[in-house]
Amino acid sequence: MQAKRYKPILNDDKPYDPTILLELNVNSIIWGANNFASKLPDSPKWLVWYKKPMGKANDDNFSDVELAWTNIKGKMCKMYPYLWSGLLREGNRDLELKERVHPTQKPVGLLINILNDYSNPNDNILDLYGGSGSTLIACEETNRNCYMMELDPYYCQIIINRWETFTGGKAVKIN
């Protein structure tokens, strides 16, 4: 089976520097941080999303896990088993897109679990890499205020469409 090809992510060809996030001096969860861990403060706090079905043979095309660094006080390493492998998917299908549209797309159900563990209702959640909009939908479901940014107009439109479909609302452009 050949892997799906996604639209390239703008600026993904440049080295990532998380310094700006750290300068915000706020509680952070940074996905993919294992790829630039040397640029982050040491932390015993990592989230591990285990996304393969138990007992399934390794598929060299995809990682069995995704890692996220966190600096949230009082929380140590935490494993989140949440099936997301090809057609095999866990959770409420009404919350998810019918197919993946972004190469680093996260399932809404996984993000709901993480938001419930690491934040409270009415908290402000900042996602500077909106991608497919999963964080926005998870915030809608858990009564968090989501502030999201996405550089690529293509993915911005996916996020807007997804939010409008999910909420029945109409996005308003603010100048």
What do these predicted regions represent?
Residues M1-P15, T19-N175:
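Class I S-adenosyl-L-methionine
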